[in-house]
Amino acid sequence: MQQAPVILSTLDKLLNWGRSNSLWPLTYGLACCAIEMMATGGSRFDFDRFGTIFRASPRQSDVMIIAGTLTKKHAEFMRRLYDQMPEPKWVISMGSCANTGGMFNTYATVQGADRVVPVDIYLPGCAPRPETLQYALMVLQDKIRRSKAIKQDAPKRLV
């Protein structure tokens, strides 16, 4: 008499496995890096095999990829899109301009996307190759697998 196999795991591991293998990025292309980001959606790089499906709606996305120069006019709009994304959410800053403002050191440019939203992964380069974005998504998958899926709320003080 054979018994059915038993799979032992934790709910954290199961949730993180599902989240890491179904990343749906919100495309937020602002400049040259957006062209490289668009190339990743083509058949040559095939991000679909990693469970990555680009979405146009923030309510259907869990990853925001900021690609290009962020101006102060765009900063408020980008923050609004970030706030509309469901939890948990992650942000990838793609390219030198999104990371530090790049060569645009003017009054109208935000010197890094991390001044507007919390950034999880920084991609260096001008403009980073699609392979670099692919590697960043794999690093993000690893980061998600190592995180705690179920957040424990801090005990509330009564006094």
UniProtKB/Swiss-Prot annotation:
It is a peripheral membrane protein. Binds 1 [4Fe-4S] cluster. One of its GO terms (cellular component) is plasma membrane. Its main location: membrane. One of its GO terms (molecular function) is iron ion binding. InterPro entries: NADH_UbQ_OxRdtase-like_20kDa (IPR006137), NADH_UQ_OxRdtase_20Kd_su (IPR006138). NDH-1 is composed of 14 different subunits. Subunits NuoB, C, D, E, F, and G constitute the peripheral sector of the complex. Belongs to the complex I 20 kDa subunit family. This is NADH-quinone oxidoreductase subunit B. It comes from Helicobacter pylori (strain J99 / ATCC 700824).
